Design a protein with these regions (language model features):
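A general, composition-driven signal for non-globular sequence regions
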Residues: 2-5, 23, 36
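Sequence/structural signature of beta-propeller domains
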Residues: 30-355
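Bacterial N-terminal signal peptides that target proteins for export
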Residues: 2-16
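Bacterial N-terminal signal peptides
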Residues: 13-26
Length: 355
């Protein structure tokens, strides 16, 4: 009898061991590409001790752009400057450009257009909250000069994008006050029409704007009572996608996790769990949401970038999102960001990497 029980017990233990082994196989650790785990690295701050580098000019770091091999150019909204940083370590570059009017958006000019009034095509272009477009090339020394003035129409520019289209070079400025996208040709002439979404509720205006491939993505935030600044809050936001001619192609996202969205970037194949997804950064809560484009052209929310502890990454005052290009602007798989922490009274430039 005892031997019979012992045999049954052995068989039961064997079955249990096999089941546990199968379970362990089923719950094998996620690969690096599957894990929602990202690391934030502060590179430059205006405050000592916050990042590896300290630069007092970096206050309310907003727009972020670079040429194919250039360092990053940052719009310092709080100091009316543009400062330059190397992507690999945030090393501060010697050139500092004066950009008056509270610069917000910034773009590198890859086109043959946008010649400055003083001669030569612009290399970098900025828009500002004073409703003016300013541009710079090496002949200007350390000052970006006014190339288009829309202050007479009370424009308040919050973002800037650029494209080289079949109709010629185009510059797109998000006029938050007048709730429109101003489009300029390669001579800084106004191109009327386009960038209209009649389904948007009143009180929302273009906030951030970014050319990705052959499309232009626009974020919308709620206007305050004076239509000068955004209103933060959970679900307060929209994202649309347009052709470079300004034709509405569709709605990317609305409400949900959006909170005064501004930054936009398309993740490369090396960016972990959200590789290939559209990343949308919230100024309102500092979180970054990922959206997958489906075969039918619609977008599906996939989640928020998280740190290794499983918490959503939140960067106070988050503005721009841009990936490196493997030159002085850092590795192609690294996401760089700007921010204006503490109610835009300070500045931060940093990076985000998978893992």
């Amino acid at each position: 009898m005892g031997e019979h029980l012992s045999g049954r017990l052995q068989r039961a233990l064997l079955v249990l061991a096999l089941m546990l082994g199968a379970a362990l196989v089923a719950v094998s650790p996620l690969t690096a590409a599957e894990r929602n785990s990202y690391t934030v690295t502060p590179l430059v701050s205006d405050q000592p001790g916050v990042a590896a580098q300290t630069d007092p000019n970096l206050v309310n770091a907003w727009g972020l752009t670079s040429g194919p091999t250039s360092p990053w150019w940052v719009s310092d909204n709080g100091t009316d400057k543009s400062t330059l940083y190397r992507g690999s370590d945030g090393a501060i570059q010697q050139l500092v450009v004066d950009v008056a009017g509270g610069p917000t958006g910034a773009v590198f000019n890859p086109t043959a257009g946008f010649v400055l009034p003083t001669g030569g095509k612009a290399l970098f272009i900025f828009d500002s909250e004073d409703g003016k477009i300013r541009a710079w090339n090496g002949a200007q020394g350390t000052t970006a000069i006014v190339s288009k003035d829309r202050s007479g129409e009370d424009a308040i520019y919050k973002g800037l994008a650029i494209a080289d289209t079949s109709a010629g070079p185009r510059l797109y400025a998000a006029d938050f006050h007048n709730a429109r996208v101003d489009v300029f040709d390669g001579n800084f002439g106004v191109v009327p029409g386009g960038f209209v979404d009649v389904s948007l509720p009143s009180g929302y205006a273009p906030f951030g704007i970014q050319t990705i491939g052959d499309r232009v993505f626009v974020t919308y935030a709620r206007q305050d009572a004076d239509a000068e600044d955004e209103v933060a809050g959970q679900s307060l936001g929209f994202v649309d996608v347009f052709s470079t001619a300004g034709d509405l192609l569709g709605r990317v996202a609305q409400h949900g996790q959006l909170n005064a969205p501004w930054g936009l970037a398309l993740a490369p194949s090396t960016f972990g769990r959200f590789a290939g997804d559209l990343l949308v950064g919230n100024f309102g809560d500092g979180q970054i949401n990922a959206y997958e484009e489906l075969p039918n052209g619609q977008f599906e929310h996939r989640g928020e970038l998280q740190s290794s502890d499983g918490r959503s990454i939140s960067i106070d005052g988050l503005w721009a999102l841009q990936f490196g290009k493997a030159g002085n602007n850092g590795p192609a798989g690294t996401l760089f960001f700007t921010a204006g922490p503490d109610e835009e009274t300070h500045g931060l430039f940093g990076s985000i990497t998978p893992g």
